[in-house]
């Protein structure tokens, strides 16, 4: 604590000192005005200027006016220096302050609605007034910390979904985001998808995370599968940590084997390992059958282990996440892909990951897998010229997903690939329980916009108070002498205090929020309420029509053997086409999806092979078979999907079709744009 005289006395002393310095400087001028020599030095008098004043001479000489100028300039220079030093000393306890609206508007964080491109976090005024909205400016990632019923949904999540200009992947824990915003997203031109594997009415789009790996070159498949395994299979308890690597190896080998067999789904991996019998015999058999060297090596190693060890590996594999695919709903929802991650930057897409609070912990492995793959695919290549849309990951109830190593790493790099994260948690302790200190600090240091609403825990208010910092203020104290009450001493000292104390954070009213922005002073803003905001309310109420719900997912009553038998009949339907197909495969194996079909390759409609599409078993709506030996690959689309489904058929690459029943050339990537009625089943062959 520094004590000093009262402020007026200090100012008076500073003025006196500056005038004295100016008077001395003027005396130096008077003494040395004719030259700097030894005689002048010997005759120097500090009162030399006094002898040139009108008070001494009786008139104002030219030397006096010049000396007076020296006094004025010197005094001002000395006084300014004293003030600068004094102001610096006053800030040594801190310079924290609240940001001003003007400076935040100039920096691009506060924008009018018409200029909003990023998320919406708050507003400068109440809902009935035209104010500026807080967006993230140049900061790609954000963190929202708000307890239950604090208004993060109506104030941040829903306004962001109504206004964000790019693609969005939204974790919709309650399902209300899809109901409240999907029509607005669709009206703005988004392709809207709802991924809800455990929906009570089975209304869900599908996503197969293995399909992307199956379309990669063989030399890339092992690495991507290991990445998939690391995010899906997690150790449940300390006892499982010693077996987690082996469990992940088993998963990798299972994926590679299923890709090789033409059943690239995690459900097929579950069925593969769920076969009855001794596991070492199963692994030995798989090692003999597999043509993939990595899968062979893993199965060989496993087959040589003791039965108890193998049981531990398979148990950790199942408990770590694979047992989720015992549910037929999960199997069906991950049997095909209705949307492509590669389209997220190319065209506006909104994917709602709808999970009820009761199912969130259960589906956490699948959600982790999905986010890992989304992040991985986005970072495989820099955005091209036609990939102009940013991708926002809107992660509500982020804590319940468990530890996401892929996102923990990607938060430092994905901004360069047009990726953004918005993490929503109830308190900072949610990060503490899931990530270690280094991981927690990684999230806090890389989220450039942090929004806090009133919270009752201990950690969050303390963090906010420390992050805002302290300011310096003048503390005045008065002491009295015991001898006389009129004899007293007043002291003023510089002290520091928190701009916002932890208890003040807890007392934050329901309409306010605190925002920390990297490199900027803190902000205290009004919360947004979309249902009462004069701009957002109109946008919300303009939504019309029905929800863009997907068709109910069909669960098959047919056995796998029946499906394979039916597929075998189809594969042998046109034996004579095989030689021609091989020829075309050699000539046109590199034709890209969507390219014009070469003139000498044509689709032939076999009228004699037409049949009623209703006779196709529901299984065939999502089944595919690759028969490389006969030179053919066959895809079947059931009656519910014949006019709109995307069929991924792989004999080395993916092909998108819109047909009832198509026969492709082996290895080819040809696209037929004809669409046939639901009542007709058409067989196509390619010939030269």
Swiss-Prot record:
TM region positions: 12-32, 67-87, 153-173
Recorded topology in the membrane: Multi-pass membrane protein
A cellular-component GO term for this protein: plasma membrane
Predominant location: membrane
Keywords: Cell membrane, Conjugation, Crown gall tumor, Membrane, Plasmid, Transmembrane, Transmembrane helix
Subcellular location per the Swiss-Prot or TrEMBL entry: Cell membrane
Annotated family: Belongs to the VirD4/TraG family.
Annotated PANTHER family: CONJUGATIVE TRANSFER: DNA TRANSPORT (PTHR37937:SF1)
Protein name, as recorded: Protein VirD4
Organism expressing this protein natively: Rhizobium radiobacter (Agrobacterium tumefaciens)
């Amino acid at each position: 604590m520094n004590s000093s005289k009262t402020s007026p006395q200090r100012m008076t002393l500073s003025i006196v000192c500056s005038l004295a310095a100016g008077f001395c400087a003027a005396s130096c001028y008077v003494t040395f005005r004719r030259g700097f020599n030894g005689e002048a030095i010997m005759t120097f008098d500090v009162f030399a200027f006094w002898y040139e004043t009108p008070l001494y001479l009786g008139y104002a000489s030219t030397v006096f006016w010049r000396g007076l100028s020296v006094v004025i300039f010197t005094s001002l220079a000395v006084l300014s220096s004293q003030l600068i030093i004094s102001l610096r000393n006053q800030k040594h306890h801190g310079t924290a302050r609240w940001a001003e609206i003007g400076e935040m508007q100039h920096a691009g964080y506060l924008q009018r609605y018409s200029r909003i491109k990023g998320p919406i976090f708050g507003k400068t005024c109440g809902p009935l007034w035209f104010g500026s909205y807080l967006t993230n400016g140049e900061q790609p990632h954000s963190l929202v910390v708000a307890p239950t019923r604090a208004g993060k949904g109506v104030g941040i999540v829903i306004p962001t979904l109504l206004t964000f200009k790019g693609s969005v992947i939204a974790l919709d824990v309650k399902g209300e985001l899809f109901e409240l915003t999907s029509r607005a997203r669709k009206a703005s031109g988004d392709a809207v998808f709802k991924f809800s594997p455990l929906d009570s009415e089975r209304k869900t789009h599908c996503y197969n995370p293995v399909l992307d790996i199956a379309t990669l070159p063989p030399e890339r498949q092992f690495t991507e599968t290991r990445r998939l395994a690391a995010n899906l299979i997690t150790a449940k308890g300390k006892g499982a940590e010693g077996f987690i690597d082996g469990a992940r190896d088993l998963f990798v080998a299972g994926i590679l084997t299923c890709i090789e067999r033409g059943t690239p789904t995690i459900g097929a991996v579950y069925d593969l390992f769920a076969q009855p019998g001794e596991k070492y015999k199963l692994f030995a058999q798989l090692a003999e059958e597999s043509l993939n060297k990595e899968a062979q090596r893993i199965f060989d190693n496993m087959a040589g282990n003791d039965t108890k060890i193998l049981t531990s590996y398979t148990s950790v594999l199942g408990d770590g996440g694979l047992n989720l695919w015992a549910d037929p709903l999960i199997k069906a929802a991950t049997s095909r892909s209705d949307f492509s991650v590669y389209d997220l930057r190319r065209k506006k897409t909104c994917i709602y990951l709808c999970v009820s609070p009761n199912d969130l912990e259960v589906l956490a492995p699948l959600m982790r897998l999905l986010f890992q793959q989304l992040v991985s695919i986005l970072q495989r290549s820099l955005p091209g010229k036609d990939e102009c849309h940013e991708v926002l990951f809107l992660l509500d109830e982020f804590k319940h997903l468990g530890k996401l190593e892929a996102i923990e790493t990607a938060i430092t790099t994905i901004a360069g690939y047009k990726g953004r994260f918005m993490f929503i948690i109830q308190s900072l302790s949610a990060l503490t329980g899931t990530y270690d200190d280094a991981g927690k600090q990684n999230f806090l240091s890389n989220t450039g916009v942090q929004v806090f609403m009133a919270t009752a825990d201990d950690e969050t208010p303390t963090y906010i108070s420390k992050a805002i910092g302290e300011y310096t203020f003048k503390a005045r104290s008065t002491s009295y002498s015991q001898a006389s009450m009129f004899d007293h001493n007043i002291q003023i000292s510089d002290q520091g205090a928190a701009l916002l104390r932890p208890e003040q954070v807890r007392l934050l009213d329901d309409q306010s929020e605190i925002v920390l922005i990297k490199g900027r002073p803190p902000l205290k803003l009004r919360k947004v309420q979309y249902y009462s905001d004069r701009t957002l309310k109109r946008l919300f109420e303009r939504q019309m029509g029905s929800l863009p719900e997907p068709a109910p997912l069909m669960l098959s009553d047919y056995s796998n053997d029946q499906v394979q038998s039916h597929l075998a009949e189809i594969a042998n339907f046109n034996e004579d086409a095989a030689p021609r197909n091989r020829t075309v495969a050699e000539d046109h194996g590199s034709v890209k999806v969507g390219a014009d079909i070469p003139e000498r390759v044509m689709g032939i409609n076999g009228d004699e092979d037409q049949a009623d599409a209703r006779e196709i078993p529901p299984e065939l709506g999502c089944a595919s078979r690759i028969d490389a030996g006969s030179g053919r690959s066959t895809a079947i689309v059931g009656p519910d999907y014949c006019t709109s489904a995307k069929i991924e058929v792989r004999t080395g690459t993916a092909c998108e079709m819109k047909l009832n029943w198509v026969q492709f050339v082996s290895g080819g990537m040809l696209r037929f744009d004809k669409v046939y009625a639901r009542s007709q089943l058409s067989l196509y062959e390619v010939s030269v």
